[in-house]
Amino acid sequence: MPITNTDESLSAASAPLKPGAFLHEIFSDRARQFPERTAVSDAARTLSYAQLDALSTKLAARLRDEGVTYGTRVGMYLPRSVDLVTSLLGILKAGGTYVPVDPQYPGKRVEHIVRDSELSLIIGDAANLPKISSLRVLALDELLSAPALQPAAQDTRIDPNNSTAYIIYTSGSTGEPKGVQVSHGNVSRLLESTQRAYGFNAQDVWSMFHSIGFDFSVWEIWGALAHGGQVAVVPYDISRSPAALRQWLADQRITVLSQTPSAFRGLDEADRGNTAPLALRYVVLGGEALPASVLRPWVERHGDQKPALINMYGITEATVHTTFKRVLAQDLETAAMVSLGKPLDGWRLHLLDANQAPVAAGTTGELYIEGAGVAQGYLNREALNVERFVELPGAVRAYRTGDLMTLESNGEYRYAGRCDEQLKISGFRIEPGEIEASLQTSPSVAAAHVGVHDYGDGDLRLVAYVVPGQGVDAWTEQARSEVAALMAENLPGYMRPSVYVPLAELPVTHHGKIDKQQLPSPAAGTALSGAADVKGLSEQEHFVLKVWSEDLGLKNIGVNDDFFDSGGTSLALIRSLSKLKTHYKINLDPGILADGATAKVLADHITRSLVQAH
């Protein structure tokens, strides 16, 4: 397998990376090289490189007709699909910058992205978009049905390193998400650097599993297209079902799979009962700290050679990935957490103290990232740019991550926490200040603090400690429901608190900071829509509620209460299904809750399965 030996530094004495290149030109080169190979597929259709090249070129011409020129920002309000890949290529070929807007985002977040990025054009479905007077919505099929025109040639004087390819919005500490501007050169050099480490080829089939609003998708799309490989779009329903995903990976002959450790836990569970042969060459893990326990069962079944297991650390502001660690079986026996490995070629890491001086060897310091991946900066956030995109001695531009690291004697980096309040859940970096600001827009909340609680096995959930505006006694079920509804309007699902804990006041230290040691257990909170009534329940309903309440901490959840609205998470659901499968000795999959994530729906399915089994 053409993969870098982990005993060798990826960055020391390596040849310099090439100058940055335009992503659409890299794609067009592959289209000329592999015209008949499959470029992208979803559940409905497949396009070859020649077909995708022709369609995206036609779209670029039509976008030029609509006024798109160099630097124009164009939104994409599309689900993962062939159309999405066609659209982003067309935008880039027209000279524009694509701004992904996940259709799963609540309306107010969509409105903020449109306003902050000053979008005037967006490709998507007008029926599902919030009505914004300044925004023209372009339907892809209508654009492509018009006569094709020859787009203007790319201005060769433009430097790919200064040309923004996309803007992805991440959580912001001031209460509003912030847009990260990433150049063509940032991404093209990421692709070159990771190619040195991996050795991708035109036979690779990459799964596109992640939301276009999460920068893992940049890697999944361009990693395939840059090397003549195939982007295989994971259908949404399959992406929510580990068992269905495991079968899909086998059916589609996927060779490159990217997962957060949280998602991989579910896939590993599903893999234990599925012997369909896999074509996987690489499983790339990132977005969260990686406990060794997540990989041990997989390695016991599959070994550590094929697929190769890779742990990568990265951040949106440094273009997806920064480090590389080939994980071997012995790594899982020597430490509880897998190391982050060494920097990619073209990236350089600095561990500095509060005065931006290097820390002593083996000492924890704040990570600053230098090199090819450092993004252009935040859109419309000049003060934050000065704070985070800094100049180190020697006129070196670097990104100040806020992540604490230690450098081990073998040259590998280990994560040691945060030096600020930022949280990380399911691969998403979350600024609790944004959630707290949203909470305090409610008249029911006078003050708030948001933290995270581990319910076991990596099941991390957001906890909101709230000071009710009219006192603790006024924190009724109705008040909680109204606040939760407000959060659903303002925040994406991964940023909504699972539990609300009412307090008379927030405990503070002598220095006026939140005293986290004095915050009560989330068990004191209200995650639920009402007290459970266990009268008249079937044995299956009673046992499901028992698992959800006692094992997952969803106290008093009712038989008809929605699991996710009651504070449950995808990982918690997988944990509960695993216990129920063991107890009843039947197969259970998250997909059975597609029509309602309630204990009644799940218990009814269990009852039917038990009847069929006998």
Swiss-Prot record:
GO terms for biological process: amino acid activation for nonribosomal peptide biosynthetic process; secondary metabolite biosynthetic process. The keyword DNA damage does not apply. InterPro entries: AA_adenyl_dom, ACP-like_sf, AMP-bd_C, AMP-bd_C_sf, AMP-binding_CS, AMP-dep_synth/lig_dom, ANL_N_sf, PP-bd_ACP. GO terms for cellular component: cytosol. PROSITE patterns: AMP_BINDING (PS00455), CARRIER (PS50075). Signal peptide: none annotated. Keywords: Ligase, Phosphopantetheine, Phosphoprotein. Transmembrane segments: none annotated. Residues 535-610 form the Carrier domain. Disruption phenotype: Mutant is defective in syringomycin production but produces wild-type levels of syringopeptin. Mutation significantly reduces the virulence of strain B301D in immature sweet cherry fruits. Its EC number is 6.2.1.70. The keyword Cell membrane does not apply. One of its GO terms (molecular function) is phosphopantetheine binding. It comes from the Bacteria. The modification O-(pantetheine 4'-phosphoryl)serine is found at S570. It catalyses: holo-[peptidyl-carrier protein] + L-threonine + ATP = L-threonyl-[peptidyl-carrier protein] + AMP + diphosphate. Its cofactor is pantetheine 4'-phosphate. PANTHER family: FATTY ACID SYNTHASE, NONRIBOSOMAL PEPTIDE SYNTHETASE. Involved in the biosynthesis of syringomycin E, a cyclic lipodepsinonapeptide toxin with phytotoxic activity. Specifically adenylates L-threonine and loads it onto its peptidyl carrier domain, via a thioester linkage to the phosphopanthetheine moiety. Is highly specific for L-threonine. Belongs to the ATP-dependent AMP-binding enzyme family. This is Syringomycin synthase SyrB1. It comes from Pseudomonas syringae pv. syringae.
